[in-house]
Amino acid sequence: MLFKRREFIQTGSLATASLMFPKFLKAFEHKNLVPPGNKVMVVIQFSGGNDGLNTVIPINNDIYYKERPRLGIQKADALQITTDAGLNPALSAFRELYDNGNLSILNSVGYPNPDRSHFRSMDIWQSASNANDYINTGWVGRYLDAQCSGCDKPTQAVEIDDMLSLALKGNKQKGLAFTDPRRLYSSSNESFYKEISKEHVNSEAAVDYLYKTMGDTISSANYIFEQSKLRPSSASYPSTKLAANLKTIASLIMSDINTKVYYVSLGSFDTHINQAAQQTRLFTELNDAIKAFTGDLKKNNRFEDVLIMTFSEFGRRVSQNASNGTDHGTANNMFFIGGDLKQKGLINTMPNLADLNSGDLKHQVDFKAVYATLLNKWLQTDDEAILGKNYQHLDFI
């Protein structure tokens, strides 16, 4: 008997979806899906617009301290890494990574005609589009389309969240979103299928599509759950959300699941009011989670196979506001953490605070050049086909 679309969504039963298991599970017949040295990328999104100037601090810049008389971090408090730059005091693990050659920092990253809306700028970053272009697929999603058309690897991209970000949505392929492998089916399917139902309301093939999608997702859930039990991380992690998410990722990486891209978020960095306390709290969570995660990877000889990237949808304005915070800005910095970096430390110069665009930093590096570098050099795919343009590759990997 054929279910109506509404009945299918309402029941959401494992029994109906199990009809798809035999065909789909052929993807998992071979025990060793991942070759040694499999490269993995972990993206950490700083949601809300992190203040880059109080992240990588221009400790000898008089303009910085003039524009931030209360908010500026003093040279004596910063974790100095070069003559002119220091890290936020809460990022001690990053200072250690820097000293060990496992941290690269790229300043003044952005895009032309920047947008100060959280939602629009995040869409631009996640879709890898120009400011005036509207694209409904993400840069990782298009990687999945290019890399996984007809392939037998349905878990190539995973987001540790209840909702899948635009970044991981392609035209034909999508990543998986979940917070815990044990709860993947119950925690992520409801919102996922609501989205599918909206996209296929008038489609005659809607029910067949839903059957297949649900079967694929539940099969993936079973596979991920079983793989996550093979080599669960035994390391001690802090009791924070980010740390728990990174521990889940560590367990999946060490289980040799075939995932190439992991995606997590931390926030909110929208620090209009009392920025110092809020950013310190978030950076403490970040710092402690990264310390545990990188230590875990090193202990299990996987650190050289993993590249961690951080980004935010925009930076903040150079001047502090009247509420001991900062308002929406433009260009920002990015961190790259890994055991196989080719260009270490500060990749480029600190932002020029004497040459601003109406109080905002001018971008010197297009973020899409960063994506092109990651796609080409780390994920070993055709970046121009995915991004629609040829960007000059950077040298940090």
Please report, for each region that a protein language model flagged, where it lies by residue.
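Conserved H-loop
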Residues: F303
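A post-motif C-terminal structural segment
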Residues: G315-S319, N324-N333
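Acidic/histidine-rich, metal-coordinating catalytic segments
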Residues: L307-F314
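Feature for exported/extracytoplasmic and membrane-associated proteins, marking the mature portion
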Residues: M1-N300, S319, N333-I397
